[in-house]
Amino acid sequence: MAALRDAEIQKDVQTYYGQVLKRSADLQTNGCVTTARPVPKHIREALQNVHEEVALRYYGCGLVIPEHLENCWILDLGSGSGRDCYVLSQLVGEKGHVTGIDMTKGQVEVAEKYLDYHMEKYGFQASNVTFIHGYIEKLGEAGIKNESHDIVVSNCVINLVPDKQQVLQEAYRVLKHGGELYFSDVYTSLELPEEIRTHKVLWGECLGGALYWKELAVLAQKIGFCPPRLVTANLITIQNKELERVIGDCRFVSATFRLFKHSKTGPTKRCQVIYNGGITGHEKELMFDANFTFKEGEIVEVDEETAAILKNSRFAQDFLIRPIGEKLPTSGGCSALELKDIITDPFKLAEESDSMKSRCVPDAAGGCCGTKKSC
């Protein structure tokens, strides 16, 4: 019965994204189109180079563009019309490569139509993008090999798949050691009742198949990923009275998380780290997640998990890392040495962000009152 239900959901989602939706404006919630922090200049410029039709058919719920992408091999799960793939392909450069996989044939056809357009737009000798018509929970069937990618991204798609554990398991399989799954998706404040989980429109709107947010950490640990790192979160609003009635007291949030795959070797205690600076678009400051922002040349105390991730990932050359007690060279500036409470709840982060926005009053310099000053 479960297999039959999953197949029915899959068919409904294909119909919704292949035939019902024609543009992002057709969506009935903001669940698939929200973003929660400013977009760096180099990404804005890359977005402007994406063909208009590709951008029009974009249904993602965030901007899944992590940092330090030069020469990386990236896989986009549920690539749709290819918007994120084409942005990423420009950022990884000619020595990098981006593969997009999507189960909706019409979306893949839109994406493939503009391969030459973007290759010429970027001035590349050959296209560094490949699109595959396939299923994100069956990457092996699509020919994607073990440990073949540096980064896996996904933009508001995993919620559309009934077997989320299988999707995460496959992402883990194809990632290299030190690799990262960086993805935006929709999460719920509680376990969803049957009425929501079987509602066709809510499935298509990324709500019916949303994961209870606490379950992500359970699945990540089961598969072997490091604990999820919350990056951004934004509360979802419903613009349809009938859908509001069905949803009732359940709340939804679009959130970006990063999951790292690394060996268990590395620092076993808290460390002090210094960001060397220089990452494209983040030369002076790297907002790693909701809990850690690293400024160039500044000492920051981190927990052992964060230290291990920095040491074993593509960020290894961007940081000086020393166990607490060993002296770090520094160019001066502030020292943020106190570990704060780690935020893991996307609803808490979204509410805090909304509260800060409501209290924010532009000052004469265009900034906000009440914001912390850097020393």
Curated annotation (Swiss-Prot):
Changing residue 306 to I: Frequency in Caucasian-Americans 0.008; not detected in African-Americans. Gene3D superfamilies: 3.40.5.100, Vaccinia Virus protein VP39. It catalyses: arsenic triglutathione + [thioredoxin]-dithiol + S-adenosyl-L-methionine + 2 H2O = methylarsonous acid + [thioredoxin]-disulfide + 3 glutathione + S-adenosyl-L-homocysteine + H(+); arsenic triglutathione + 2 [thioredoxin]-dithiol + 2 S-adenosyl-L-methionine + H2O = dimethylarsinous acid + 2 [thioredoxin]-disulfide + 3 glutathione + 2 S-adenosyl-L-homocysteine + 2 H(+); arsenic triglutathione + 3 [thioredoxin]-dithiol + 3 S-adenosyl-L-methionine = trimethylarsine + 3 [thioredoxin]-disulfide + 3 glutathione + 3 S-adenosyl-L-homocysteine + 3 H(+). One of its GO terms (biological process) is methylation. GO terms for molecular function: arsenite methyltransferase activity. The keyword Methyltransferase applies. Changing residue 287 to T: Frequency in African-Americans 0.108 and Caucasian-Americans 0.100; enzyme activity is 350% of wild-type. Its EC number is 2.1.1.137. The keyword Ribosomal protein does not apply. It is an enzyme of class 2 (transferase). Pfam families: Methyltransf_31. The modification Phosphoserine is found at residue 335. InterPro entries: Arsenite_MeTrfase-like (IPR026669), Methyltranfer_dom (IPR025714), SAM-dependent_MTases_sf (IPR029063). It is found in: Cytoplasm, Cytosol. Keywords: Cytoplasm, Methyltransferase, Phosphoprotein, S-adenosyl-L-methionine, Transferase. One of its GO terms (cellular component) is cytosol. Catalyzes the transfer of a methyl group from AdoMet to trivalent arsenicals producing methylated and dimethylated arsenicals. It methylates arsenite to form methylarsonate, Me-AsO(3)H(2), which is reduced by methylarsonate reductase to methylarsonite, Me-As(OH)2. Methylarsonite is also a substrate and it is converted into the much less toxic compound dimethylarsinate (cacodylate), Me(2)As(O)-OH. This is Arsenite methyltransferase. It comes from Homo sapiens. The gene is AS3MT.
